[in-house]
């Protein structure tokens, strides 16, 4: 059974990055091996540019990777996951921004080939919870209703967000039982010839 240490973990923040009180930043302090995906222009979310940055970082290692994304970082992660990245093993997509707000709906429409969990909030100003549930279905992801937590960011006062950490552990477990998971991470074996 895989553990969190089996994976390289990338943190993909949204618009304006995640400040020091954001749960993503707190998780990076708790887990120093987590790597942040740095964008050149945090105030200018261009899906293709942000996605290329994430894809580049994912391809720097063959180790299976999980992405912990927030807001526009979720759209970035989905866009990257819809391309061929063999070492992407799963995604935790927290409070995704509504793709319609950024006019990128078509670019992020498709079923993911890796396990994913979408976490939505009943009062998220960036995406109504019913739409978040619909997008989770489109992506083939599990949907988790986190209650009324706003945009699930620093303003939500979540501290280290223990519930979110439990969802990350759930994602880790899903990587071993997800259809196709074994084929994604094990290299093809050459048939042996008996003499």
Name every feature range the model reports, one short phrase each.
Residues 2-63, 189-192:
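Active-site catalytic motif of lipid deacylating hydrolases and related acyltransferases
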Residues 33-35, 137-153:
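Catalytic histidine neighborhood in serine/cysteine hydrolases
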Residues 49, 154-168:
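Post-His helix in hydrolase/transferase enzymes
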Residues 86-99, 115:
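A conserved short beta-strand
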Residues 17-18, 99-100, 122-127:
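Acidic catalytic loop of the alpha/beta-hydrolase fold
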Residues 28, 122, 127-141:
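Conserved loop-alpha-helix segment in the C-terminal half of the alpha/beta-hydrolase fold
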Residues 67-78:
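Gly/Ala-rich beta-loop-alpha elbow adjacent to hydrolase catalytic centers
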Residues 112-113, 117-120, 124:
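Short beta-strand/loop motif that positions the catalytic acidic residue
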